Amino acid sequence: MPCHRDEIPAHDICAALATEFKMPCTCSTGFHVEHASKDDLQTVLDTTAELIDALKKHVARVMRATWDEADEVLAVHEDGSVIGPVDRIKAHAGEGVLHQAFETFLVEGTGDDARLLLCRRSALKRLWGGVLSDSCAGHPEVGEELAAGAARRLQEECGLTSEQAPLNQLGHIVYREDHGDGNCECEWCAVFAAHVDAGALRVNEQEISEVRPVRLGEIDAYLAGHPEPLAPWTRLALEDADIRAKLVELCQE
């Protein structure tokens, strides 16, 4: 980072980011610029502010794909009634704690041209990273309705507003699936779907590494593991006869 003094603005960038994300600043560096005018210094300061802002946004996007120890999810009974908040890590450890979740299927086109947009989860994901799944999944925040949480995550992961992706609830599934590393998914999972215009997605690459349009006629092969298996909650939703029928109906509209 070019600077008038070695510690400015390189140190300021590191200090700002360390403060924002509560992490230690290990080092910073810069090099001296001879005969810098007032305008030159102002340009450097303005550019530094822009860089800090851009880095904050980028790191925030990456951190959304990880788990904060302070994160909570909503524990529920088998019928979906809420018990109360539970630590997210605890909810996914060992036998798990049944908690609220949602998944959303996005559809492009109608009739014979309809395509289900399956998305590959980023390798950054703690559970089932790199696996093909529904278009977007997540957990509602404490005090947030399921549909509102699904709309929020569509904005964060796919860049879609609620107007671009009006949600229809298709049903729900209740399941538990071991991840094989001492963690699991144990969810009461609402299933949503929405029609979107072709090319509307603006994916967050820290969340999604691939968008794959799939014809409804290809779904059974994916459920059998060909050409590859789906995330367990995606497979279970598509195996549910009522959910599948409502999804097919939506594709015809």
Positions of predicted regions on the chain:
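Acidic, metal-coordinating catalytic segment for phosphate/diphosphate chemistry
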Residues: 66-111
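Nudix hydrolase/Nudix homology domain
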Residues: 66, 130, 173-253
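Conserved Nudix-box catalytic region and its N-terminal flanking loop in Nudix hydrolases
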Residues: 89-101, 112-156
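Short, solvent-exposed loop/turn segments that connect beta-strands within catalytic domains
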Residues: 109-115, 180-182
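A short coil-to-beta-strand element that immediately follows conserved catalytic motifs
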Residues: 161-171
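Short, internal acidic amphipathic alpha-helical interface segments
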Residues: 1-22
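Phosphate/ribose-phosphate-bearing ligand recognition and processing surfaces
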Residues: 20, 26, 31-64
